[in-house]
Amino acid sequence: DMHEPSGDFERLALAIEKQWNIQGLKADLAIMRRLQPVLRKGDWKVTVAVYQSHDGATPRILDLWPGFYEGSIYGLAIDLGSTTIAAHLCDLRDGSILASSGLMNPQIRFGEDLMSRVSYAMMNPGGDVEMTKAVRNALNYLADVIATEGGIDASSIYEMVFVCNPVMHHLLLGIDPVELGQAPFALATSGAVHITARDLEVTSVNVAAQVYILPCIAGHVGADCAAVALAEEPNKSKDLVLIVDVGTNAEILLGNESRVLACSSPTGPAFEGAQISSGQRAAPGAIERVEIDPITKEPRFRVIGRDAWSDDPNFAELIKDTGVTGICGSGIIEAVAELRMSGLLDAGGLMGSAEQTGTNRMIPQGRTHSYMLYDGTTQGGPLIMVTQGDIRAIQLAKSALYAGARLLMDEMGVDHVDRVVLAGAFGAHISPKHAMVLGMIPDAPLDKVFSAGNAAGTGARIALCSKSARAEIEATVGLIHKVETAIEPRFQEHFVNANAIPHFTDPFLLLRAIAPLPNVSFNTQSGGGEGGRRRKR
């Protein structure tokens, strides 16, 4: 219309306002450059992808197509963990998951745990930049991989939602995490973050893709814990629920509709197979389940990817494609718990000798003994042992986990909880009974211990698909009270008491009613043979 001075964008914005009540629409220059050809190709009919934030920020056009576009648009929900990066590819029309994928966090080469990475940044000028580049490269790769698995073009990904612990949060954003390594553990920002994928140098997705990062709760309690709270909703529970997100850095929530507490506990990577002599990440061929006969002391096990136990006559044939390659986190937890229940391991965490235990599977190694779980050396495979060092690594990890939970219970003024929820991608595979035998979690009825799977990833997916959920979690984190384990003297007391298996002072009466905990002690001198003298404590 020669008599209508408005530009094509202004007319489009007015039409969208009239039809969809979306006001104040904006568009980047890249959209402006495409606008007129698209409008004319579609004979002034157009489909527009609009990003409209829950907080009233300016709505923006992300993409447009001539005529009626019937294709889908997609989003990524990403749990950016210290050890692994897990992602869900979701159809933004209905929230369905097209594909899920993950990879190891490449920052592991700079340090296996969070404080090691903070130290790397402190000690090496530009170290934070190196770690930021590594994780961003991994995200580009992961986006391409998951798009291929989902059968879509990565350029159809228009939004990414991240949940992560505070150190990963800062490194993702390119913020030096040094302040998180020293009191008062100050975050550069604790609120939700709205940016673009370009800001994070994630270029494999759509050029206009938006990024939302959930808010952090406090200095050591991050957006991953907020995502768990969003998924599990302890603030809406009438029962007192303890939620433990098991990982390299455990996040713990305790609460009900009256009050919610949170803390972070530095468990380290042992639960994920690291720092274990035959440890590996969960993958086909890794031992994931273990049982030890309390009479014969003989083991049997299962590996990831096969349902058969190792005492199955056809086991060798069934695992010929994968073999037995090592032991993952759930496997080492069950192995240590089974050693305790079969009387091969005492409450203090010491393993006995062959003479003390009556089994030649106890192999002397210097001044300690190890339990031979599997010997595949005659077929060119590995010798998989549970060593005294493995036991100690698990003791330290589980003590940190228990101490964090117990600290929250002290703050709440309770000795028992109504429900326990094991969360995290790894938490989904933990046997509640074996976790209780180890003393990873406080004593509770086994039928009140549940697995929530990767609750942080679930929370990320909820936030990806729901604007109201984003508003809800932003309000909820302000009501969660954070307990700082690093400066709380009772944490160390609880940690020391939790070194025993299951515990030095807590009798674990509910556990003892269903699981044998033999009253054995190997902290003595034993006769003859290498390794006969036990280490004293």
Predicted regions and their residues:
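Nucleotide/phosphate-binding catalytic cleft detector across ATP-hydrolyzing
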Residues: D1-A77, S82, M131-R136, N140, ...
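Glycine-rich phosphate-binding loop of actin/hexokinase-like ATP-binding domains
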Residues: I78-S82, A87-M115, V178-H194, A227, ...
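Carboxylate/His-rich catalytic cores and anion/metal-binding grooves
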Residues: I85-L103, Y158-E159, V163-G191, A335-E338, ...
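N-terminal phosphate-binding loop and adjacent alpha-helix
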Residues: P106-T148, Q275-I276, P284-D293, A393-L396, ...
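Short glycine/threonine-rich loop-to-helix capping motif typified by GTGT followed
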Residues: C164-E179, G255, R361-P364, V414, ...
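Glycine-rich phosphate-binding/hydrolytic loop that grips phosphoryl groups
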Residues: T203, C216-A231, Q395-S399, V449-E484
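Catalytic phosphate/nucleotide-handling subdomain of diverse soluble enzymes
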Residues: N256-L261, Q275, R406, D410-V477
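A contiguous, well-structured pocket-lining segment that forms one wall/lid of small-molecule binding clefts
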Residues: R340-D410
